[in-house]
Amino acid sequence: ILLQIKRDVLSQYAVLPGGGQHKGETLPEALRRECLEEINADVEVGDLLFVRDYISDHHEFAEANGHVHELELLFACSLPEGYQPQAGEDPDPGQIGVSWVPLDQLDAVNLYPRVLRYYLLHLDDPQRLIYLGDVN
């Protein structure tokens, strides 16, 4: 899996590439734009994998996140053949790198949201959830 590596005043951590949708963009258009900005890749957007609510007041970073409620939609994506991990022209604040991480090594990564580890390792489960709820 390809992850953005970030650093803040507390720690280094990893997140999936992506971000906000601009007015007039479809979800795939927004994801392609965000991936160009963050990981310098023109991705092919595939199936919707997960939907997650994030209500900051319910989680450990409530004070730092300013009482937000976000809806996150996670898609499977394909990268162009020969892609080498690199930051795009407009990386996220705190982004210090882009890295491939084998799924069987996700436990060694400080991944956010943490709950994704389990779900990413069980993508083949025919009973897997799509809507994950308000989880972190």
What is the predicted function of each stretch?
Residues 32-33, 49, 53-55, 68-72, ...:
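Internal catalytic or translocation cores that form aromatic/hydrophobic pockets or channels
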Residues 1, 70-74, 98:
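Structural motif
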Residues 11-14, 84, 88-136:
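Nudix hydrolase/Nudix homology domain
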Residues 11, 52-59:
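Short, solvent-exposed loop/turn segments at secondary-structure junctions
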Residues 21, 79, 103-106:
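Hydrophobic pocket-lining residues within nucleotide cofactor-binding pockets
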Residues 1-16, 43-44:
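N-terminal strand-loop-strand
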Residues 16-50, 75:
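The catalytic Nudix box helix
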Residues 56-86:
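Active-site-adjacent beta-strand/loop module that shapes the phosphate/pyrophosphate-binding cleft
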